[in-house]
Amino acid sequence: MSGRQRSVAAAVHHQRQLSDNPLDMSSSNGRWLQSTGLQHFQSSANDYGYYAGGQGGGGQAARGYQNAQRGNEFFGEPTTPQYGARPTNQRKNNDESEFSPGLLDLHSFDTELLPEIPVSNQLDGPSLFNPSQGQSFDDFEAYNKQPNRSRVLAENLAAEKERMNAVAKIKVVVRKRPLNKKESTKNEEDIVDTHANCLTVHETKLKVDLTAYVEKHEFVFDAVLDEEVSNDEVYRETVEPVVPLIFQRIKATCFAYGQTGSGKTYTMKPLPLKASRDILRLMHHTYRNQGFQLFVSFFEIYGGKLYDLLSERKKLCMREDGKQQVCIVGLQEYRVSDTDAIMELIERGSATRSTGTTGANEESSRSHAILQLAIKKSVEGNQSKPPRLVGKLSFIDLAGSERGADTTDNDKQTRLEGAEINKSLLALKECIRALDNDQGHIPFRGSKLTEVLRDSFMGNSRTVMISCISPSSGSCEHTLNTLRYADRVKSLSKGNASKKDVSSSTMNLRESTKIPLSSALPTPSNFDDDVNEMWTEENDEFDASDYEQDKQMWKKNGKLEPSYNGMAQERIPKPTIQMKSRDMPRPDMKKSNSDDNLNALLQEEEDLVNAHRKQVEDTMNIVKEEMNLLVEADQPGNQLDGYISRLNTILSQKAAGILQLQNRLAHFQKRLREHNVLVSTTGY
């Protein structure tokens, strides 16, 4: 037995020397064994009984060489031939210049069967390479020096990691808040049921005969949090998994979306502080002495303009660099090293943020607030250079979306703010839709908000969306719009299962087409507003494929199917609704004109403020010139004619500047009156 082991060890040692070019051999396995002096290896392999009888010695030696490379044991089923073994009569032994197909198959099988190797049980049983049987650890060198094995394992792990990252690129979480006092006073009911990562909305509708019925809408997301979930659990579910990734050159973003008063600010407020604690802990322990630094910045987007919340609302400018990366010029960043400083900065910025009272919420956020935690690393050996950005974690508290019907008691300025908010949210939705459809052009420049969020959806990024919904029956339409919006975002994540509501949403569209007056019976005074509002929301969900399917239902044998049963009233309005869908460009044209007017008003406002600022600067220069003139007038021997001439010139300059500013102001007032924005002209 010891002689047989020595012969096998010698065979393995000799094969290791030839492993650099294992295919450079003769096709005749018997001649190959003779040339290497391994004639006795054939009998040794037969004694182990690993191959079935009748096989040639060359095939057995090749199998022994394969198992020597893999480090497998020669125990198990002794009479069972290995899968894929070829008889010797199929091998080409005539021409010595040709390779043996058996040896070529060994290498292909080696790569194919690699994941099936039971590594954990390598040293169990009577293995030929077990050191307890008298052999040294040098015999393992042939097994350890296998670049193909490690390369395949590395490629498999990299591919698996890439697949996991692709699935988790965008995570959508829905949070349901409890009923508030205002909703409880109105006796509104909770119409949202949550279970695991699913939720169901029970929408109450009316048929044509005013019979009430309940329609269920089911949605599936990555996580659904009910009203009992605390902010700590929200953080563990949403932000905590992405915090370690920002040290790996990844930009992560967490933003909250929902109607005004749905709890977005309440949800987002504690998340940055909790994330900063974890970041500092990683910097001080896991990445200690690696030069990482934490910087905090806080700004808002109000009325299409950027303001620094940590520098007394200083106005900022957004620019793009040569790499098409968004840069905010003038944004103040504060380096922090403890959570107390971060808490102070967050409280100071939150107190400066623009808020207002609307018909739907007494403390509504009227701006999009962006808090950024940037990880930077100092340049080694050169402390004079600024640190380079490694990763970034952004928290975006979006302003609440609102409908025109909810803002009837708001003033003109609040309505103007709401129009700008809805415009930016619509631009964000268009970007998400373009990404979902794999379009070549993504309209990120539709608003300032989408420009800021560009790096959140492009490149190596991670995004967490928290959709906040209200459970009350009075906010059912808002809730469904928010959930459909979140489902659109979720569709960006490849391989997701959040398409559960596709069939129900298609049924909802058909149902609304059948009974257009089932949702409500508006009064004549509000009918036009409700129709415009209905088309604003329905146009986003309209699909030509659904129309074609409905068209097949209308027709039977090339004609409209006559029916005089109880469903006749539901079939009659369909052509009317279809005629309205043909007129869809009209509301789009009206909406585009409204956006153009809004942009023009905002631009004129900015021009007026800049003109006023320039007038103040010119006035200060004129005042300095007047003071110098008075000093010269007090000097003895001053010429009176020169004093009068210079004074006349100064007064003319002052009058011309004031007149020009008054004309610009009067023109701007006229434009505001045309668009019914100014409530009164008091104070002008």
From Swiss-Prot:
Residues noted as binding ATP in the record, renumbered to the chain: G258, Q259, T260, G261, S262, G263, K264, T265
Alphabetical UniProt keywords: ATP-binding, Coiled coil, Microtubule, Motor protein, Nucleotide-binding
InterPro entries: Kinesin-like_fam, Kinesin_motor_CS, Kinesin_motor_dom, Kinesin_motor_dom_sf, P-loop_NTPase
Bias (Polar residues): 18-31, 79-91
Coiled-coil stretches noted in the UniProt entry, renumbered to this chain: 596-626
GO biological process: microtubule-based movement; regulation of cell wall organization or biogenesis
Protein name: Kinesin-like protein KIN-13B
PROSITE patterns assigned: KINESIN_MOTOR_1, KINESIN_MOTOR_2
Organism of derivation: Arabidopsis thaliana
GO cellular component, one term: microtubule
Bilayer-crossing regions: none
Domain Kinesin motor: 169-492
